[in-house]
């Protein structure tokens, strides 16, 4: 029966994988719902306050670029040639061979440069043209040939074109997507969890599918009780920090994190899913690798280490078991549990795996940095070629003996190794850090320039264009059987109680890596959801054509901000009422079904603007004169933050104005401001957009 369950688990997992690759959006069991377009008023202010409404910030984001591109290609004739030129250059930069670049560079030059020069309408500098002409004249076609044009295209898009984008519906859509992104609160219900694929000291790793996009991931679940029992809180939190540091920027050679969240019992990391097993497993199945095969793995691992080291992260646990293969055979460095940030202080702890640890790591009290990883790389490459670490002779398992040999033994390299390989390994396995390859001041570049890698084009390595020496079998789960992986004994943690103080440690644990979420959405449901939302909004516009839109009331007035909130201000009502609110310098108005035409609170009536919590939801509490209160609930975190800020600012400015104006004797002040009266102070733009 157990065997049947294992087979069914494997079949279910493999089917989910195949469907996710083919049509991930069709596998989405939840739907992302974009907020109303009116969210723009709040989100634009929220993003502006954080310096996010700039050309550079929006153009560099995946969804921002896609919406900006759509606007330029379909709604702004003068910008279309610039964006088309930009996209052709980006395609050129990814070409694999020089022959392809020669042909494509000439096509780009003829279509986008020479054609415009002949028409006397070339909007670029003479120096950019001469740069490209000079290289083409010498038949030089580097990947960055058109870089001067990239800079000038962006400069041309940065001004009026970008401003028109900000004023368009496409920027409104960007605000809608950013609101969704900034309000992500993941739980286990957001994933379909499949079979177990691994186990570690604190928990298990499962294959899983994200419900709203259909994308497959690995879910690493750490048990909070087991962490507490082993006093591993610092390690668990450190892994989250290290993953957040390395998971930004384009690096296909590290198992990166897209999300982190926690439940009352578990910490969960959502990671890249690697289906091809690890190099330790394949070394045992395949036998030792040839120099050529090892060169492939070494090159991709070097780029992974370079990505970490550029972010001041030392990995400290490089070994074949931590190098995972994807379904195509390319590799990624996994498990950053022992990684360390050395940007402010160098580590000196002796951590890692015996047989791969650098001498400076083994020596107590000695500080080190990325140097440790280059020594470990030498040990690992030796193992791929010989089947054992250079310091683990005769399969000894005595850790002290292995460490002693690491500190004292001169490594003897077999005569069968090529001179280039010997040079590489001798450089990496130098006990003296000051003489070690990769530690002489230029980091990974020194290793990449080794004669052993002379035949490689590092751009092609980065683009994963070289064929892997080993392709994992398709249609198989390249992981141990679920029953062989086993499970933890629940009795171990039976007496462990999680206190509020334990949970407080993980208060800031949840995280969404923005660029990885945007990439996931772009690859799966972006077009579908945009099309569906366009249809819904078009129907709503047609329906409301005669009635008018809520936003229209703010037009031409000194409205600071407007949008939907839910209120609970009547002492006899316990239900939330969704209304459309308008914040002016001297009052807060709202409209909705069943409301009086002049529903408002003046700033004179408000005594304070505070944050409170009702049924675990953060809310705004407006304390009103006479002991009354007015409670507001927002649909998302950014809205709550921005409404609180703007309400407090308006209240503070109104108070300051009252203090500056001399009090008029014997003239009572009305607590209600008529809508027709001139506002006290003008803050913000005319319509808050």
From Swiss-Prot:
Residues 454-521 form the AGC-kinase C-terminal domain. It holds the Pfam family PH. Residues 191-453 form the Protein kinase domain. It catalyses: [beta-adrenergic receptor] + ATP = [beta-adrenergic receptor]-phosphate + ADP + H(+). The active site is at residue 317. The keyword Transferase applies. Keywords: ATP-binding, Cell membrane, Cell projection, Cytoplasm, Kinase, Membrane, Nucleotide-binding, Phosphoprotein, Serine/threonine-protein kinase, Synapse, Transferase. The gene is GRK2. This is Beta-adrenergic receptor kinase 1. Specifically phosphorylates the agonist-occupied form of the beta-adrenergic and closely related receptors, probably inducing a desensitization of them. Key regulator of LPAR1 signaling. Competes with RALA for binding to LPAR1 thus affecting the signaling properties of the receptor. Desensitizes LPAR1 and LPAR2 in a phosphorylation-independent manner. Positively regulates ciliary smoothened (SMO)-dependent Hedgehog (Hh) signaling pathway by facilitating the trafficking of SMO into the cilium and the stimulation of SMO activity. Changing residue 578 to Q: In a colorectal adenocarcinoma sample; somatic mutation. It is found in: Cytoplasm; Cell membrane; Postsynapse; Presynapse. One of its GO terms (cellular component) is cilium. Residues 558-652 form the PH domain. Residues 1-190 are annotated as: N-terminal. Residues 54-175 form the RGS domain. Changing residue 3 to A: 85% reduction in phosphorylation of G-protein coupled receptor rhodopsin. It is an enzyme of class 2 (transferase). Its EC number is 2.7.11.15. PANTHER family: BETA-ADRENERGIC RECEPTOR KINASE 1 (PTHR24355:SF22), G PROTEIN-COUPLED RECEPTOR KINASE/RIBOSOMAL PROTEIN S6 KINASE (PTHR24355). It comes from Homo sapiens (Human). Belongs to the protein kinase superfamily. AGC Ser/Thr protein kinase family. GPRK subfamily. In contrast to other AGC family kinases, the catalytic activity is solely regulated by the binding of substrates and ligands, not by phosphorylation of the kinase domain. GO terms for biological process: cardiac muscle contraction; desensitization of G protein-coupled receptor signaling pathway; G protein-coupled acetylcholine receptor signaling pathway; G protein-coupled receptor signaling pathway; heart development; negative regulation of relaxation of smooth muscle; negative regulation of striated muscle contraction; negative regulation of the force of heart contraction by chemical signal. The modification Phosphoserine is found at residue 670. ATP binds at residues 197-205, 220.
């Amino acid at each position: 029966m157990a065997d049947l369950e294992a087979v069914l688990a494997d079949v279910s997992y493999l089917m989910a994988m195949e469907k996710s690759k083919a049509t991930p959006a069709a596998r989405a069991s939840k739907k992302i719902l974009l907020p109303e377009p009116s969210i723009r008023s709040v989100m634009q202010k929220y993003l502006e306050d954080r310096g996010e409404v700039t050309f550079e910030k929006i153009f560099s984001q995946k969804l921002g670029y896609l919406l900006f591109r759509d606007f330029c290609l379909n709604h702004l004739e003068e910008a279309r040639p610039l964006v088309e030129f930009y996209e052709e250059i980006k395609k050129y930069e990814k070409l694999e061979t020089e022959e392809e670049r020669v042909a494509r560079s000439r096509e780009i030059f003829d279509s986008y440069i020479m054609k415009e020069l002949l028409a006397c309408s070339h909007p670029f500098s003479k120096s950019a043209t001469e740069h490209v002409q000079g290289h083409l004249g010498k038949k030089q076609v580097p990947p960055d040939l058109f870089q001067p044009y990239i800079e000038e295209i962006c400069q041309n898009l940065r001004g009026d074109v970008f401003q028109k984008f900000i004023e368009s519906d496409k920027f409104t859509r960007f605000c809608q997507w950013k609101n969704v992104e900034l309000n992500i609160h993941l739980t286990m219900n957001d994933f379909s969890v499949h079979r177990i694929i691994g186990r570690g000291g604190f928990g298990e790793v499962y294959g899983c599918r994200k419900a709203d996009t259909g994308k497959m991931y690995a879910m690493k679940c750490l048990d909070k009780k087991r962490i507490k029992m082993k006093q591993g809180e610092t390690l668990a939190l450190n892994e989250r920090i290290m993953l957040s540091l390395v998971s930004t920027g384009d690096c296909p050679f590290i198992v990166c994190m897209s999300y982190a969240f926690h439940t009352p019992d578990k910490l969960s990391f959502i990671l890249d899913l690697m289906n091809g097993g690890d190099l330790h497993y394949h070394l045992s199945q395949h036998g030792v690798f040839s120099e050529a095969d090892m060169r492939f793995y070494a090159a991709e691992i070097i780029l992974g280490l370079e990505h970490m080291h550029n972010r001041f992260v030392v990995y400290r646990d490089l070994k074949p078991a931590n190098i995972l293969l994807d379904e195509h055979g390319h590799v990624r460095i996994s498990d950053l549990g022992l990684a360390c940030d050395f940007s402010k202080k160098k580590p000196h702890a002796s951590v890692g795996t015996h047989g791969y640890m650098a001498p400076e790591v083994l020596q107590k009290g000695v500080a080190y940095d990325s140097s440790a990883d280059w020594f470990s790389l030498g040990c690992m490459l030796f193992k791929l070629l010989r089947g054992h670490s250079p310091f683990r002779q005769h399969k000894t398992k005595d850790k002290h003996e292995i460490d002693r040999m690491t500190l004292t033994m001169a490594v003897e390299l077999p005569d069968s190794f090529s001179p280039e390989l010997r040079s590489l390994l001798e450089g990496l396995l130098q006990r003296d850090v000051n003489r070690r390859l990769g530690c002489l001041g230029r980091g990974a570049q020194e290793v990449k320039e080794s004669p052993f890698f002379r035949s490689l084009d590092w751009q092609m390595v980065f683009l994963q264009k070289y064929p892997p020496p080993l392709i994992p079998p398709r249609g198989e789960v390249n992981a141990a059987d679920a029953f062989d992986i086993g499970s933890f004994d629940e009795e171990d943690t039976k007496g462990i109680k999680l206190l509020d103080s334990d949970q407080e440690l993980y208060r800031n644990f949840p995280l969404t890596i923005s660029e990885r979420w945007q990439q996931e959405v772009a690859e799966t449901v972006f077009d579908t959801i945009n099309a569906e939302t366009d249809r819904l909004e078009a129907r709503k516009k047609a329906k409301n054509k005669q009635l008018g839109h809520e936003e229209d009331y703010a037009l031409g007035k000194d409205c600071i901000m407007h949008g939907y909130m839910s209120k609970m201000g009547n002492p006899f009502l316990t239900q939330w009422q969704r209304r459309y609110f308008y914040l002016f310098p001297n009052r807060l108005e709202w409209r909705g079904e069943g409301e009086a035409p002049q529903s408002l609170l003046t700033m004179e009536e408000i005594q304070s603007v505070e944050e409170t919590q009702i049924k675990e939801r953060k809310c705004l509490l407006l304390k009103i004169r006479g002991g009354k209160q007015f409670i507001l609930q927002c649909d998302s975190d950014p809205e709550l933050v921005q409404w609180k800020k703007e309400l407090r600012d308006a209240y503070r400015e109104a108070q300051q104005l009252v203090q500056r104006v001399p009090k008029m004797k014997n003239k009572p002040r009305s607590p209600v401001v008529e809508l027709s009266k001139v506002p006290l102070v003008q803050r913000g733009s005319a319509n808050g957009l």
